[in-house]
Amino acid sequence: MEKYVVVLAAGKGTRMKSKLYKVLHKVCGKTMVEHVVDAASGVEPTEIVTVVGTGAGDVEKVLADKSKFVFQEKQLGTGDAVMTAKEVLGDKDGATLVVTGDTPLFTTDTFNELFKYHTEKGNAATVLTAEAPNPFGYGRIIRDEQGNVLRIVEQKDGNPEELKVKEINTGVFCFDNKKLFEALKHVDNNNAQGEYYLTDVLEILRNSGENVGAYKMPDFSESLGVNDRIALAQATKIMQRRINEEHMRNGVSFIDPDTAYIDADVKIGNDTVIEGNVVIKGNTEIGSECYITSGSRIIDSKIGNNVTVTSSTIEKSEMEDNTDIGPNSHLRPKALIKKGAHIGNFVEVKKAEIGENTKVGHLTYVGDATLGKDINIGCGTIFSNYDGVKKFHTNVGDHAFIGAGSTLIAPINVADHAFIAADSTITKDVDKYDMAIARGRQVNKPDYWHKLPLSKNED
């Protein structure tokens, strides 16, 4: 049986009160519509068609080649939205999954179970349902005495008895594809909203003698639709818990999983420990046996094995095996910390390579530089890389020693085994084995204290 997917993503989302198209709001680092399409892709459909509206260009840019697109000119309801997919799917044999783009919590497993149930029962239509603790706002599933689905009643159209029902429509359906598009021809907008409801297809099919069923999924939380910022936060919290639990099942320890925010695409190796109040975002990869302490923030970076990150920020950078950083240090984009290197406290590294076993202990800025191996960078060293117009590069060779308080003014080359005396301002290249001293000589003036204004305070 061929499988198809229609994703409804044309809604404006006015309740979000945002310039951003609703389905493009992110949950754990991925847009809602990406979550939906990725979950649907797991059922291996022949085609995914996304229905877009006013934000079509933005949605198409995000999904790219994951989907085909059809345009709904006016938002006239879910039935009208699905009908726009007829140009792509109308003549296909198979089963079609219909899902909204603002439900990021659905899983591939749930979609697979729905397809399986739909096929085994030989249904023309199957609605995915759930038992809601508070069903207000949801469409209710109305069944006959034998438990067969009669229809779905929307909140604004239901009578008091119907609104007592707690089994709700999740907004996900599986249809016989050809029967779906044939039934859509008979849907009208005779309802409180004046819209064409996709749910009316169920009653049309049933009245035609077709089998209409419902598969009740066990986890109601998957069905959460995001219509405002409150629901967005709720979805993020649920997704965060799901992501963290998956990492824990794979051998990662979380000291306080409720306060560790990990994006959906992050990869973490086993025996790594994540403390509370940690943020790891984007396409970050973290190896095995690492320790990430509270207050750390890692974005789009690659962390090797046995790395310790202590209350530091790492952005679009790489730390190789057996390195450490922090506390309170910052790797800005394009920093590379090679094996065994040490980045101490209050160090900023930007667009620089720190060689193997090199130590940058504290209170240092390293920008636009290449440092070799086994170098010691003293406290308070500044790599001065900017003249107000252009940025320049500094090279420091293997086994060099940079004394505390030094400033290296680029462009400059410090050779292997060179020695920079403390508090020097270096403006010229330093050759191999040489020591550079560039500071004013100390002058002691005997008995000068008594000439200072301070001495008068002693009288």
Curated annotation (Swiss-Prot):
Biological role stated in the UniProt entry: Catalyzes the last two sequential reactions in the de novo biosynthetic pathway for UDP-N-acetylglucosamine (UDP-GlcNAc). The C-terminal domain catalyzes the transfer of acetyl group from acetyl coenzyme A to glucosamine-1-phosphate (GlcN-1-P) to produce N-acetylglucosamine-1-phosphate (GlcNAc-1-P), which is converted into UDP-GlcNAc by the transfer of uridine 5-monophosphate (from uridine 5-triphosphate), a reaction catalyzed by the N-terminal domain.
Binding site for Mg(2+): 102, 227
Source species: Lactobacillus acidophilus (strain ATCC 700396 / NCK56 / N2 / NCFM)
NCBIfam families hit by this protein: glmU, PRK14354.1
Cofactor note (record): Binds 1 Mg(2+) ion per subunit.
EC number: 2.7.7.23, 2.3.1.157
Protein name stated in the entry: Bifunctional protein GlmU
Keywords in alphabetical order: Acyltransferase, Cell shape, Cell wall biogenesis/degradation, Cytoplasm, Magnesium, Metal-binding, Multifunctional enzyme, Nucleotidyltransferase, Peptidoglycan synthesis, Repeat, Transferase
